[in-house]
């Protein structure tokens, strides 16, 4: 196929899609040019079905530093593992695409997005999402798209689609929404305490823009799309399914209705083991043994799935016996740990998170050097999910995509209420340790984070709480669930996380397993989440009503002084010599910004005071009219040089030593002598003139007759 180009304008920027020129061996490939951002997307499918019990979809978002005209850092000088932003963008694209493949599809699919040029005013992630949908849609991969995504900002009461950098910085909302022509299927958002009505309107505005992008894609697919390949779907033998359901469904239903999680899991597992043992014995010698046992496991999964959903939609009974809008039992505690700067323990049912806060000087902020201009990140929220939290063994190591994503969600939720840098000049790190998990652990980490912040004395604007909402839908009827647990998340259709204060929403995240949800469901879920959020905030505020007025004794204290910008080099010294000496002498940490704000950190207030004195003396300037007790350091024929303070000297001209005539300076002054002087002039080069005689009254002039007599006598 020769190169074909499709052009439109979207959100005020040119949008160009090119097909047929590059990556022609992939099943589908596109080059998307949006503004001056360029993204190459290639989609590839394996020829055989995998044997796993899940759909092996991999989406990558690769940031090439050359795209922004930057040289990679580090001694290797080449791109390494994906940045946090790249990982989050890959997840952002994966989530709306994954529901668009058929149930039972098991062929491995890889979608690789490579950023070739980067324009910070034209969203490369949204270009990559469009490219991913298009590469799959025009390929022979059986993808039930297209989908599209947009970013939405809210500036001065107006919604803006795919805002530029300046608009993003002014916005009260940072929303990414994706979906199909008919419905929304993915949401990721941070917001500055916006009400539910505005959030819902933003989602609908975003979906309208999505429909425009999908219409554009449909034109391209009609022109260059390939016929979809026939692939084998994972299906079970109908007669085997009927037999197992008839024999064991009643036992499985009874096990699923056990309310306590561990007991329910044990009862359910016992039924499954009995079924598997029976069929292992029957088909041990059968040449189709592996396929049959795979079918047995899949049938049991389907039976459990169907029963959980039936209980909720028909009987309005949840696995643990709660009402559809009921939260599990709550508990909150602060100061769980000694020595640390702040800690909070939050428990909701069988989900528990411990959040630990650390404060540090601004010099410890994280430096982000990606495609955007380098910047410093003051607030970090890290989320850890050890396998023991679900009673299992498993991999331990660096944080995976899920942990990075959950940490970022908590970070967005809590960042909206942090004090300004001017009011609280600290770097802040929160670490959420999930100690026990039965669903909604990311939201428990947000609640625990609020407790830790307030216990540490961080003056947040308001406490934040989070709740996870679920959905069970059969296409006609639906049930929205409050505070979903693991089983409801696994077998449900939606995981909709909502975090916020009493004032409004600070973060949203939605993933669904069906092709989309309606505005009515969104509105109902937001209203139900608000009620639950307020209930959790009641508990948090009962535990700690407001941030403590003082920091923990172990936290670094801080004092800030302002110096003239041209004095920064004086404090730092040649090669950092002066500031290093101050740090070594006092034991403090010192940060100086480009505006001359000097922040001094230490757990010892006396050390801070000593460092302040040293810095103040370094940047001190002599001012006209001020009087100093100075020391003579050099004598010349024309006057004496005196040291006013530190390394600041002034000249006392011979004419300024006394009111009477001075013939020799050395007759009046000697080196090391201490004298009082008054500054009378500072020139534009910083040279200082001082006077001794200005500090004594001028003697009266002699009368003329006396002067004549004295003259004749002389």
Swiss-Prot record:
One of its GO terms (cellular component) is cytosol. CDD domains: KH-I_PNPase (cd02393), RNase_PH_PNPase_1 (cd11363), RNase_PH_PNPase_2 (cd11364). InterPro entries: ExoRNase_PH_dom1, ExoRNase_PH_dom2, ExoRNase_PH_dom2_sf, KH_dom, KH_dom_type_1, KH_dom_type_1_sf, NA-bd_OB-fold, PNPase. Keywords: Cytoplasm, Magnesium, Metal-binding, Nucleotidyltransferase, RNA-binding, Transferase. Its main location: cytoplasm. Residues 700-714 have a biased composition (Basic and acidic residues). Its cofactor is Mg(2+). Residues 625-693 form the S1 motif domain. Residues 691-714 are annotated as: Disordered. One of its GO terms (biological process) is mRNA catabolic process. One of its GO terms (molecular function) is magnesium ion binding. It holds the Pfam family PNPase. It is found in: Cytoplasm. The keyword Metal-binding applies. Mg(2+) binds at residues 489, 495. It catalyses: RNA(n+1) + phosphate = RNA(n) + a ribonucleoside 5'-diphosphate. Residues 556-615 form the KH domain. Involved in mRNA degradation. Catalyzes the phosphorolysis of single-stranded polyribonucleotides processively in the 3'- to 5'-direction. Belongs to the polyribonucleotide nucleotidyltransferase family. NCBIfam families: polynuc_phos, PRK11824.1. This is Polyribonucleotide nucleotidyltransferase. The lineage of its organism: Bacteria, Bacillati, Bacillota, Bacilli, Lactobacillales.
